């Protein structure tokens, strides 16, 4: 029995044919399928091909059925290898998972970044997220003192 | 690359340990206020509730030590949140020698209240006093609705769905009852718990737990299976809350070399239904055991790094384990607790409990 295929189009014009059952792990795509506007393919203006490839890889792995009977433990191990990526790529994945509304991928990518940054200094965090420090040195020191416990 | 929008940064931050979140208040003024906002603290709590942990406190030389905080046992009770390092001293309360305190949470009014035994039952004074946390001025007040008189309380309390339960012994012919205190309405009820009567001599090993939503009592004793000494867990579950019917379950634990040779106590039940046993004293290696009654599996887990200080044999301390610990950033008005020994404060000596809301037991 052949499974229904749909076409996903990345922002940089590349097309990917994917099983519908795999693609609808994205709530965004699932809604479009329901609304029946997928005939000419689904344009994903916010997702570059480099990232879409990873998203599709994830969805294929997580589409668990008789053909792909993978255990939770093996999925967790696979997650670790899958997330061995550059920080900028992981950030792009967060944006894509958010846009495509794939909860488990969103959770995984956010948790991975949280684990990467938890030991970092405020200065490193500001640089990672482009946060401007609008505290004067005295104000910053006051906040630090107030929360001394967190810095020990 | 497109910068990550603030709402997604919040999602990332909500998955950090509490300590990091508090540290990140120094990022900028905007983030200091974002990370304190009710929206974020609720989000953080939701995430934290999905990964409940075991919290350990070790007691040694009169000091109760959480990983970063040290508190000393004294007469004046204190409520503290080890996640944020904040504490509140409770106003002094005249209590009789073996009076207990209980912490409960009203999920509707979202308030913590402390219920304390005060005087032995008499006509002159109220037996209990109540204190609501989070108000400007903390003060004890008498309960309006009287509690049926009992001889003494026999267990620590457990709060399930806004009702505080604890075991007590009746006056006259000794028998066990469960006292129920509705945290919101502050009404007392009680019902029979005669199934625990054969333990009246020594109820110290019995704890009340929330087993899959039902009030239960667990303790253990040694048994015998042929040549071998076994460990038996006995659990009484209030299967029918309306009719107050208890069902007893006895589990003989699978053989485990470490468990069979150490001093342990029952720490509680996780939201997944595992009964947690914990070694009583700090030592190296330190183990915690998870027993699943349905699968009859016993898993031992080594906990590392209590710190060389506590692990040295001559320094061993009594360990208390709190199951289903969830990090909570919501902070009652309170002073910052300094984590150095020179600034010791006091811990509620009656219940040794910290302000982690028990209502998290409901989140499956």
UniProtKB/Swiss-Prot annotation, chain A:
GO terms for cellular component: nucleus; SCF ubiquitin ligase complex. Keywords: Nucleus, Ubl conjugation pathway. This is SKP1-like protein 12. Belongs to the SKP1 family. SUPFAM superfamilies: POZ domain, Skp1 dimerisation domain-like. Part of a SCF (SKP1-cullin-F-box) protein ligase complex. Interacts with ADO3/FKF1, COI1/FBL2, EBF1/FBL6, PP2B10, At3g61590 and At5g49610. Residues 94-152 are annotated as: Interaction with the F-box domain of F-box proteins. Pfam families: Skp1 (PF01466), Skp1_POZ (PF03931). GO terms for biological process: auxin-activated signaling pathway; jasmonic acid mediated signaling pathway; protein ubiquitination; response to auxin; response to jasmonic acid; ubiquitin-dependent protein catabolic process. Involved in ubiquitination and subsequent proteasomal degradation of target proteins. Together with CUL1, RBX1 and a F-box protein, it forms a SCF E3 ubiquitin ligase complex. The functional specificity of this complex depends on the type of F-box protein. In the SCF complex, it serves as an adapter that links the F-box protein to CUL1. Plays a role during early flowers reproductive development. Pathway: Protein modification; protein ubiquitination. The keyword Nucleus applies. Expressed in young seedlings, roots, leaves, floral stems, inflorescences, and siliques, with a slightly higher level in inflorescence than in other tissues. It is found in: Nucleus. The keyword Iron does not apply. It comes from the Eukaryota.
């Amino acid at each position: 029995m052949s499974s229904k295929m749909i076409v996903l189009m990345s922002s940089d014009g590349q097309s990917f044919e994917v099983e519908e059952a795999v693609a609808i792990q994205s709530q965004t795509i699932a809604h479009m399928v329901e609304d029946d506007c997928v005939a000419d393919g689904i344009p994903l203006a916010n997702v570059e091909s480099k990232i879409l490839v990873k998203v599709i890889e994830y969805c294929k792995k997580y589409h668990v059925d008789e053909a792909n009977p993978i255990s939770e433990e093996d999925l967790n191990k696979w997650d670790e290898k899958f997330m061995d990526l550059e920080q900028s790529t992981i950030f792009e994945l967060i944006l894509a998972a958010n846009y495509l509304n794939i909860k488990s991928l969103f959770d995984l990518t956010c948790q991975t970044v949280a684990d990467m940054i938890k030991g970092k200094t405020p200065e490193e965090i500001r640089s990672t997220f482009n946060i401007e420090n609008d505290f004067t040195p005295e104000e910053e020191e006051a906040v630090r003192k107030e929360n001394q416990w967190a810095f020990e | 690359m497109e910068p990550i929008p603030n709402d997604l940064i919040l999602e990332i931050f909500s998955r950090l340990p509490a300590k990091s979140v508090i540290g990140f208040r120094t990022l900028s003024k905007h983030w200091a206020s974002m990370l304190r906002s009710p929206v974020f603290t609720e989000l953080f709590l939701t995430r934290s509730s999905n990964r409940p942990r075991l919290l350990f406190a070790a007691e040694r030389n009169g000091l109760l030590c959480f990983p970063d905080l040290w508190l000393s046992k004294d007469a004046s009770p204190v409520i503290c949140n080890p996640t944020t390092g904040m504490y509140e001293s409770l106003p002094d309360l005249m209590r009789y020698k073996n009076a207990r305190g209980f912490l409960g949470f009203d999920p509707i009014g979202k308030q913590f209240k402390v219920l304390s035994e005060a005087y032995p039952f008499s006509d002159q004074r109220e037996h209990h006093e109540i204190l609501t946390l989070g108000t400007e001025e903390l003060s004890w007040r008498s309960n309006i609705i009287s509690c049926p008189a009992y001889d003494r309380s026999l267990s620590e309390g457990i709060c399930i769905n806004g009702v505080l339960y604890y075991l007590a012994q009746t006056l006259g012919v000794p028998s066990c009852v469960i006292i129920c205190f509705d945290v919101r309405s502050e009404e007392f009820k009680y019902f029979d718990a005669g199934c625990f009567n054969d333990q009246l001599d020594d109820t110290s090993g019995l704890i009340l737990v929330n087993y899959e939503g039902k009030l239960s009592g667990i303790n253990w004793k040694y048994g015998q299976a042929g040549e071998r000494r076994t460990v038996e867990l006995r659990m009484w579950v209030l299967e029918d809350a309306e009719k107050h019917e208890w069902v007893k379950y006895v589990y003989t634990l699978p053989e485990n070399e470490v468990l069979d040779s150490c001093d342990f106590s029952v720490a509680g039940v996780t939201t997944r239904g595992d009964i947690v046993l914990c070694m009583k004293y700090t030592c190296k290696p330190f183990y915690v055991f998870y027993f699943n009654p349905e699968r009859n599996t016993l898993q031992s887990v080594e906990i590392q790094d209590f710190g060389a200080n506590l692990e040295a044999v001559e320094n061993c301390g009594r360990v208390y384990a709190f199951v289903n610990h969830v990090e909570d950033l919501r902070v009652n008005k309170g002073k910052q607790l300094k984590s150095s020994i020179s600034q010791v404060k006091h811990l509620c000596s009656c219940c040794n409990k910290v302000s982690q809301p028990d209502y998290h037991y409901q989140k499956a």
